[in-house]
UniProtKB/Swiss-Prot annotation:
<protein>
    <recommendedName>
        <fullName>Dual-action ribosomal maturation protein DarP</fullName>
    </recommendedName>
</protein>
<dbReference type="GO" id="GO:0043022">
    <property type="term" value="F:ribosome binding"/>
</dbReference>
<dbReference type="GO" id="GO:0019843">
    <property type="term" value="F:rRNA binding"/>
</dbReference>
<dbReference type="Pfam" id="PF04751">
    <property type="entry name" value="DarP"/>
</dbReference>
<keyword id="KW-0690">Ribosome biogenesis</keyword>
<keyword id="KW-0694">RNA-binding</keyword>
<keyword id="KW-0699">rRNA-binding</keyword>
<dbReference type="GO" id="GO:0005829">
    <property type="term" value="C:cytosol"/>
</dbReference>
<dbReference type="GO" id="GO:1902626">
    <property type="term" value="P:assembly of large subunit precursor of preribosome"/>
</dbReference>
<keyword id="KW-0963">Cytoplasm</keyword>
<dbReference type="InterPro" id="IPR023153">
    <property type="entry name" value="DarP_sf"/>
</dbReference>
<dbReference type="InterPro" id="IPR006839">
    <property type="entry name" value="DarP"/>
</dbReference>
<comment type="similarity">
    <text>Belongs to the DarP family.</text>
</comment>
<comment type="function">
    <text>Member of a network of 50S ribosomal subunit biogenesis factors which assembles along the 30S-50S interface, preventing incorrect 23S rRNA structures from forming. Promotes peptidyl transferase center (PTC) maturation.</text>
</comment>
Amino acid sequence: MMKNMARKNQKAPWEEEEEIIWVSRTELKNDMLALQKLGEELVELKPSALAKFPLPEDLAEAIKDAQRFKNEARRRQLQYIGKLMRHIDPEPLQAALDKLRNKHSQTTALLHKLEQLRDRIVAEGDSAIEVAMEQYPEADRQRLRLLARQASKEKAGNKPPKSSREIFQLLKEAMLAKQEIEEESEDDLDSAE
């Protein structure tokens, strides 16, 4: 009994001020699985999107290999990618992936707005076309008016909405042109600094 008391009263081999963080094996394993899952998300990306990520050369090569593999080889390659990711900081990769996901959701929201604008143009005519021209001055006003009249006739005659689709495509092209102009102006500002 005295021996046990003596052990309990002994001073620990580290200083009291030092804080030792004990990490369980389960926690380590969960961290590794999270890295492997991040690697799996990177493997699912298209090569064009993957090129925008700040990847070390060996990791980029491993991801390209994993995209070719099937079944068991793919699973082993994903584990290897997880192992490679232990040696790099995953934060920039996660941030770039989040930015990419956000961009897709923004694009979807813009397409929904374009659909609503198209429906307004078909229903209201010139007043909605004026709103569209304020948002997208690159759009062809005369073509929009012509397509709006045709879409109204198609809707009244229960015909397929060919003109409505053309209005949507016209608005989409105008939106893309506006985005390109904005991106070029941002690039010009960045290069000027």
